[in-house]
Swiss-Prot record:
Gene name per UniProt: ldh
The name this protein goes by in its record: L-lactate dehydrogenase
Principal EC category: oxidoreductase
Assembly behavior: Homotetramer.
Positions bound to substrate: 85, 91, 123-126, 151-154, 232
CDD domains: HicDH_like
EC number per UniProt: 1.1.1.27
Residues noted as binding beta-D-fructose 1,6-bisphosphate in the record, renumbered to the chain: 156, 168-172
Active-site residues (renumbered): 178
HAMAP family per record: Lactate_dehydrog
């Protein structure tokens, strides 16, 4: 019996794309990886460099340079290409530049006969995931953005440092836009099963104002990293690898990816970060948390910001 060979096509061999490729090989997530970039020499150099470390990888991963034609039999096409976020520039200011780039990329991929899952990483990710869905014509379940997976991971890490617990035992979500209007879901945050609100109430060492500062630190993390080193790439690459693993291994894992809402959380016709079940088919379902009134208001504001950004670019886009 022939075993299915998992194949990922990576478009964009910049900082994020290269780090993603490195993570895929180090974790043995896929059987085959094709790297595609307008800068052929850079992509070929990455492939050579990655191949030279194959002796240390947990499993064989066929890694090669390719073209859009190689997307035809890929299970996942991960798009990391696009204009970079500059110091002081918000993710949403990147819209104009990256929409033009994406229209060309997606049309080339679809022309190959691709019928898999798009995974979008380029910012502003919620806008570009919506655009990828529109440009591709694929079912919404098979177009996924990295969403707030990294923001949630940042949140869990910072809370783990604050409460002195492993990040794996901190269960907390950041939802909404991957950007300035994202919000924490305090009403469902817990450490080892104990609600954060209860920890604060019972221990004077923990203060809500310090937790609020953690939220600000999460929101501004990318800006701080960009100021220091010019770009963020390791964290987002690891989150992309996590999503890829959930898809290829058919995990039914719940991750805060950017997914299409059609009435859930009171939002409609928008891609936005919410907890969703991710498996081989893409988005298998959306986990609708029971938000408190403040969280509902913040989430709808976040969705509204994204919809207003989309409106000039997609005439048929519905605005509540």
């Amino acid at each position: 019996m022939n075993k299915h060979v998992n194949k990922v096509a990576l478009i964009g061999a910049g900082f994020v794309g290269s780090s993603y490729a490195f993570a895929l090989i180090n974790q043995g997530i896929t059987d085959e990886l094709v790297v595609i970039d307008v800068n052929k020499e850079k992509a070929m150099g990455d492939v050579m460099d990655l191949n030279h470390g194959k002796a240390f990888a947990p499993q064989p991963v066929k890694t090669s340079y390719g073209t859009y034609e190689d997307c035809k039999d890929a299970d996942i096409v991960c798009i990391c290409a696009g204009a970079n976020q500059k110091p002081g520039e918000t993710r949403l200011e990147l819209v104009e530049k990256n929409l033009k780039i994406f229209k060309g990329i997606v049309s080339e991929v679809m022309a190959s006969g691709f019928d898999g899952i798009f995974l979008v990483a380029t910012n502003p990710v919620d806008i570009l995931t919506y655009a990828t869905w529109k440009f591709s014509g694929l079912p919404k379940e098979r177009v996924i953005g990295s969403g707030t997976t990294l923001d949630s991971a940042r949140f869990r890490f910072m809370l783990s440092e604050y409460f002195g617990a492993a990040p794996q035992n901190v269960h907390a979500h950041i939802i909404g836009e991957h950007g300035d209007t994202e919000l924490p879901v305090w009403s469902h945050a817990n450490v080892g099963g104990v609600p954060v609100s209860e920890l604060v109430e019972k221990n004077d060492a923990y203060k809500q104002e310090e937790l609020d500062q953690i939220v600000d630190d999460v929101k501004n993390a990318a800006y701080h990293i960009i100021e220091k080193k010019g770009a963020t790439y390791y964290g987002v690459a690891m989150s992309l690898a996590r999503i890829t693993k959930a898809i290829l291994h058919n995990e039914n894992s719940i991750l805060t990816v950017s997914t299409y809402l059609d009435g859930q959380y009171g939002a409609d016709d928008v891609y936005i970060g919410v907890p969703a079940v991710v498996n081989r088919g893409g988005i298998a379902g959306i986990t609708e948390l029971n938000l408190n009134e403040k969280e509902k208001e913040q989430f709808l504001h976040s969705a509204g910001v994204l919809k207003n950004i989309l409106k000039p670019h997609f005439a048929e886009q519905k605005v509540n």
